[in-house]
Amino acid sequence: MNQDTKTKKPEKRTRDRKSYHHGDLYRALLDAAREEIAVNGAQSLTLASLARRAGVAQSAPYRHFADRDDLLVAVAVEGFQELSVTLRDAANLGGDDSGVRRIAAAYLRFGEQNVERYRLMFASRLVPDAPTDSLLSKAAEESYQLLLGCVSERGRSGPYGSATAVWAQLHGLVMLKADGFVPEPLVALLSELAL
């Protein structure tokens, strides 16, 4: 057999995609999901797009999340936990403003700064469809209880009614702002609310 007729071994192909290992893939995926949601909303998020954004194989997200909804629940849980920290910090600040006003301002800022995540938390079926003993339900309830506690400390009649009325005002403003109906910063409207 001469040199020209020898079979050549196929050259090994190298992948264009970088091989990337995350020390904390779960955290990297959640961060990538938050970024994607902030830019494009939750409706466009797929586990494949998330894997590309995180620089990992398309199967990698399935090591941590059963499906897309499982990932969205994890993002929403973190959102409610962050909202609770924000509200708790505002309530503990003290100062001339009432606790309700401080919490209201913090709530409005959170909603305004996290529009698409806020939509995921409050304008999706995730919380209503979650089992009451789930991490998501508990995280959502904690944020409401912080608001309820602050309103009831003020001695308003019927803390559930008052807290729900305060929450309805805040939520309504955040959603109106998110949908483009309120041009000014939400905190500027704080003095007009029935707090």
Specify the residue positions occupied by each region the protein language model found.
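Amphipathic alpha-helical packing segments from all-alpha helical-bundle domains
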Residues: A130-R156, Y160-T164, S191-L195
